[in-house]
């Protein structure tokens, strides 16, 4: 497709507020609230088949509407236990998301289907098919999918940065996430839901043998629900499966020159 056919648009409204307070020299807190709305649309016309001087075109239109509400609160305290300094961070998050997604297949006026065949030319002419008949493509007639999703995530996290000495820092922490999702297939009249409770640990070690040299190692885990990042669908098979868990291990050396 051309630049007028293959398009991507994004409209977003974001409102964010943050409140910070210093309780003492060793204690501070922060509360953040964000509300956003966005509309995103992908539309593409692409080659799905090729045979000599003929090319078969297919396409889709994929609009998404999403509303998010984020709430985050955390408290940071510095505590000394003898010669060891602890920087303890605790917090909570709440995320609510309403998502609507639609998927349209292309509809060609000559075939009444999502595909049409054209003669290869430069530039391509998509107004006349390979049989010489005038044709027109529509991106909003043939709906393939329509879904709405409701997502709620509640999280609690804690991290302790332990300054054992001037050249040794240890970090330990983790977070607990409760993830609830319900996906309604408007076109099929069905719905699927799932709830996941996951604990994700993290830890790290930084050793500084010299002022300009740091040796570090870290380990962390994260997870991705079976609904994916776009929350478009959750079939019966995916609803019965545990989320994907990712492990990340990093070891390195940092030199300040």
Which sequence ranges carry the predicted segments?
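Face-selective signature of the C-terminal outer-membrane beta-barrel domain
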Residues: 15-38, 59-184
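Glycine-centered flexibility motif
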Residues: 2-3, 16-19, 52, 91, ...
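Outer-membrane beta-barrel proteins
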Residues: 1-16, 56-72, 147-148, 186-195, ...
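Generic detector of short, locally flexible boundary/turn motifs and exposed helical patches
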Residues: 52-58, 134-137, 216, 228-230
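Flexible, surface-exposed loop regions and adjacent strand-edge segments
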Residues: 1, 45-54, 104-115, 186-195, ...
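Periplasmic-side early beta-strands and strand-to-turn transitions of outer-membrane beta-barrels
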Residues: 1-10, 38-52, 179-181, 186
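Membrane-embedded beta-barrel scaffold of Gram-negative outer-membrane proteins
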Residues: 18-34, 38-44, 211-216, 242-257
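Structural signature of Gram-negative outer-membrane beta-barrels, strongest in the C-terminal barrel
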Residues: 66, 85-89, 93-97, 147-257
């Amino acid at each position: 497709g051309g630049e007028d056919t293959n398009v991507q648009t994004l409209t977003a409204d974001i409102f964010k507020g943050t409140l910070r307070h210093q309780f003492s020299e060793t204690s501070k807190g922060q509360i953040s609230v964000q509300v956003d709305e966005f509309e995103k649309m992908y539309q593409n016309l692409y080659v799905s088949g090729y045979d000599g001087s003929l090319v078969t075109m297919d396409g889709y239109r994929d609009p998404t509407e999403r509303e998010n509400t984020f709430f985050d609160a955390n408290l940071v305290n510095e505590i000394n236990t003898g010669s060891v300094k602890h920087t303890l961070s605790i917090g909570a998050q709440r995320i609510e998301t309403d998502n609507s997604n639609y998927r349209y297949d292309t509809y060609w006026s000559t075939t009444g289907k999502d595909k049409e065949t054209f003669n290869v030319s430069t530039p391509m002419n998509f107004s006349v098919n390979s049989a010489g008949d005038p044709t027109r493509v529509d991106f909003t007639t043939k709906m393939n999918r329509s879904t709405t999703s409701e997502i709620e995530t509640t999280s609690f996290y804690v991290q302790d940065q332990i300054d054992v000495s001037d050249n040794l820092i240890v970090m330990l922490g983790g977070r607990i996430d409760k993830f609830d999702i319900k996906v309604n297939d408007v076109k099929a009249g069905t719905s699927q839901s799932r709830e996941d409770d996951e604990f994700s640990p993290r830890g790290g070690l930084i050793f500084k043998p010299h002022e300009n040299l740091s040796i570090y190692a870290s380990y962390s885990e994260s997870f991705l629900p079976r609904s994916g990042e776009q929350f478009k669908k959750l079939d019966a098979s995916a609803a019965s499966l545990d989320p994907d868990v990712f492990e990340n291990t990093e070891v390195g050396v940092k030199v300040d020159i």
